[in-house]
Design a protein with these regions (language model features):
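Conserved structural motif at the start of ABC-family nucleotide-binding domains
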Residues: 6, 21-23
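The feature captures the beta-strand-to-loop junction immediately N-terminal to the Walker
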Residues: 37-39
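Helix-to-loop junction immediately C-terminal to a conserved catalytic motif
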Residues: 52
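Conserved ABC nucleotide-binding domain
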Residues: 100, 106-121
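Hydrophobic anchor residue at the start of the ABC signature
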Residues: 132
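Catalytic Walker B motif of ABC-type/P-loop ATPase nucleotide-binding domains
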Residues: 143-147
Length: 208
């Protein structure tokens, strides 16, 4: 039996009387890509944030057996620092050797600006690519992505999916949230969420 790289056991999240996510189980095993699909407010971001450790579940637990990279929807970097400065800083925080060299490789890999502008002044697409680059600095085996290509053009989207598909092919696991039905082709498994619960519906029934 394959040991999951990440396992969520009955995780749920409440905000007061509002149930954002009902108790949910999820395993990510090596070599798979899981798509979380559903309309706005379905619980996709909440589930991913719990898996990433960005928010605490109201109940349940998450077991991680591998390094996790996390790409949230919102900027996960310091707006006053340049792309290079952010990458160097996060590389150091991850304990990456030769942080400057690692930052340089990511700048090139994701075609990020090297002109020293604060990242807060970059385009939405550049900021999102910077999020992905930061998530990959620690060479994670699990990559969690919350609508990572929503602000990207086709070429930029292709670059992100090349990275995610390669990680899966190398025995990692990817879990991503999307409302873009074309991106489901990258998934080996699709989970439909609706009203904070895993739904017994097809993608077509949800988006009709």
């Amino acid at each position: 039996m394959t040991t999951p790289l990440l396992r969520a056991v009955r995780v749920a999240r409440h905000y007061g009387d509002v149930e954002a996510l009902a108790p949910t189980d999820l395993e990510l095993i090596p070599g798979e890509t899981v798509a979380l699909v559903g309309p706005n407010g379905a619980g996709k971001s909440t589930l991913l944030s719990i898996l990433a450790g960005a928010i605490e579940p109201s109940q349940g637990a998450v077991e991680t057996h591998a390094r996790v990279g996390w790409v949230p929807q919102r900027p996960a970097h310091y707006a006053r620092l340049s792309a290079r400065e952010n990458l160097v800083l996060f590389a150091q925080l991850e304990g990456v050797r030769e942080a400057e060299s690692a930052a340089g490789r990511m700048l090139e890999r994701f075609a990020l600006p090297v002109d020293g502008r604060p990242s807060g002044e970059l385009s939405v697409g550049n900021r999102q690519r910077l999020n992905v680059a930061i998530a990959l600095l620690g060479e994670p085996r699990v990559l969690l992505l919350d609508e990572p290509t929503a602000a990207l053009d086709p070429g930029q989207r292709r670059r992100v999916w090349e990275v995610a598909d390669a990680l899966r092919a190398e025995g990692g696991a990817v879990c991503f949230a999307t409302q873009n039905l074309e991106e489901i082709e990258h998934a080996t498994r699709t989970i439909v969420l609706q009203d904070g619960r895993i739904a017994s519906l097809t993608v077509e029934e949800v988006f009709g």
